[in-house]
């Protein structure tokens, strides 16, 4: 698990050599192949928060951890741990007086008229009156 930086010739060589084996996992196949073939490998041990989000359940779990900073250690308001993202171009979010929102994160461009519990709504999501979103990550446009 991690972030990998390769020169294109080295990566292409490894992938082409492993293609017939259906061996595409970097940690299990590509890195050992590179080591066995004399490529120089370097590592940096990172002790902060990091999660492999290579599966849909893992991506959902990582998003849910944002909603539970006491247990995950994630603090979105930490000045030393800035999160940079592309501006969505959306207006601010709107939460109607009839809406019920608890333990959730609502991003720009969302319109909430229904119920949202323990969920994350990304830009442009609309929750109509009477609708219930619970324990969910909903990605908009």
What kind of region is each of these model predictions?
Residues 9, 17-141:
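Left-handed beta-helix
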Residues 3-13:
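Conserved nucleotide-sugar donor-binding
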